[in-house]
């Protein structure tokens, strides 16, 4: 499943485990170039591709042409009739919950993560709420609350942070409450924005630990 809608619509509901490579706005030729690169790197494996656009028309038509030009076998490209508009009428077809995606989650112990604080080759991202973050966090972390992780607003905030402030070539350590839902949700958002990211790791670090044990805590 390849979703080619713009972020605003995509963030409101997507097919679970679908991939995302936008072709909207259609007049933006740079998106066609990005899709060409994405297709060559990620879609050239002989598997069938089901395209999801807004209504199953213009976006899917343009994406089909781009994929064909990128070398994808035309007989393996399908358009989902009616696009996301039709899928939205099917109970449970679209979701904003990304925590159960098929991905090989990586974890690191809190102490090992703390030892990486200050490493210029590692990015730390704290996705806890603002008050919890202020009560104690690792030095030098970016912060983006994902407490309401399944809302378009929270996901858009995460998307923009990944786009504007994160380095796609460096690994990311994500800190949430327990290393579960918030971190997993953020993983998917970061992955989608930074598709060539080397490594993303969920970590659970209990901030009630005494700060003298971990001088890297603020």
Role assignments for model-derived ranges:
Residues 7-50, 54-122, 129-173, 177-218:
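Rhodanese-like catalytic fold shared by cysteine-dependent sulfurtransferases
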């Amino acid at each position: 499943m390849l979703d080619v809608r713009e972020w605003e619509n995509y963030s409101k509901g997507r097919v679970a485990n679908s991939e995302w490579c936008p072709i909207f706005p259609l007049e933006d030729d740079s998106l066609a170039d990005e899709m060409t690169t994405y297709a060559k790197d990620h879609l050239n494996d002989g598997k069938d591709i089901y395209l999801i656009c807004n209504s199953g028309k213009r976006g899917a038509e343009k994406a089909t042409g781009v994929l064909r030009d990128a070398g994808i076998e035309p007989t393996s490209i399908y358009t989902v009739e009616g696009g996301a508009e039709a899928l939205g009428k099917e109970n449970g077809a679209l979701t904003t919950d990304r925590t159960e995606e098929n991905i090989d989650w990586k974890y690191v112990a809190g102490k090992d993560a703390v030892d990486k604080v200050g490493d210029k080759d590692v990015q730390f991202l704290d996705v806890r709420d603002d008050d919890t973050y202020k009560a104690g966090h690792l030095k030098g972390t970016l912060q983006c609350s994902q407490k309401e992780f399944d809302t378009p607003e929270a996901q858009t905030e995460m998307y923009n942070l990944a786009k504007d402030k994160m380095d796609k070539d460096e690994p990311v350590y994500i800190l949430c409450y327990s290393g579960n839902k918030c971190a997993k949700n953020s993983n998917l958002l970061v992955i989608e924005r930074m598709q060539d990211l080397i490594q993303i790791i969920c970590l659970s670090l209990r901030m009630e630990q005494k700060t003298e044990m971990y001088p890297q805590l603020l």
